Amino acid sequence: MTTLRDLYPEIEPYASGRLEADEIHSLYWEECGNPKGIPVVFLHGGPGGGCSATSRRYFDPARYRVVLFDQRGAGRSTPNGELRNNTTAHLIVDLETLRKSRGIDAWHVFGGSWGSTLALAYAQDHPEACLSLTLRGIFLMREWEIRWLFEAGRKFRPEAWEALLDALPPELREGDPLEGYAKLLDHPDHAVRLSAARRWSVFEATLANLIPDSTRIAGASEEQVAYAMARIEVHYFRNNRYEPEDQLLRRVERICHVPATIVQGRYDLLCPPITAIQLHRAWPGSRLIIVDDAGHSATEPGIRSALVTVMDEIATQ
């Protein structure tokens, strides 16, 4: 029987700071592990999710120099939940600015969920900066993938779906929930915005694990987390789709030479496995690992084990 790998022990950053991205956004970054180690950048999900202490623990701290940053409006970056100057293109520029400011010639890129979207977009624009890609829970920002979020909730977590709809005023319940939440999250009353943000964030957290994780769900309702996640995610879903929508698949040829591993939960309700399979088939030389007893979250035991194992393998190459 295969023994599952656990995360590395908790670790504190040896350096942290802020990147003044523009006149609006101040981005939090940190480094942990070995300052002279193999550089890897962690790209969090959402968009709007932010990094956590757990994000540091997929990498051997003796061998990796781990760079983490909270994307625009997320986590410890400010202003919280800010939508101005917040697009995929802005985040790609931020990544390059951060890499150069930290004196890194090229790095390994590690991202899951929305982090996989950003990793692909970044690598396709800057392949020379990417030593490898390790991706989990693939999301390509296509219309049907966005709609799948609601379909999965309605069909597999009906209680969570009903709670999501209950937050909408009666006149918005029959329409597109994405547009309904966009209205609530832009409401002039902060209390209305925050209540809607919590409903949205909790709904998504309920779908993240094969068996819903009460700790994750409780954390999703925390004010700063929920506000950034809901506002930024709805903003991106409405305004930052690709044209053509399969652009990230079409441009894989730009990074075919970059080593890639794709880790995907078989029962992922947020990012269904077909997307990971399509990416793998479009990317000659990529490796696909399907974890049969897992949902979406990187903390699912099988996914966690696969990610730690992959990063250990990269460190020994």
Language model feature labels by segment:
Residues 5-28, 233:
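N-terminal cap/lid segment of alpha/beta-hydrolase-fold proteins
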Residues 21-79:
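Conserved HGGG/HGGXW glycine-rich cap/lid loop of the alpha/beta-hydrolase fold
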Residues 89-107:
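Conserved acidic catalytic loop of the alpha/beta-hydrolase fold
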Residues 105-144:
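Conserved hydrolase catalytic core segment
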Residues 128-180:
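A catalytic-pocket lid/entrance helix-loop region that shapes and gates access to the active site
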Residues 255-256, 262-264:
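Short beta-strand/loop motif that positions the catalytic acidic residue
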Residues 269-275:
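Conserved alpha/beta-hydrolase "acid-adjacent" motif
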Residues 286-317:
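Catalytic active-site module of serine/aspartate enzymes centered on a nucleophile-bearing elbow/loop
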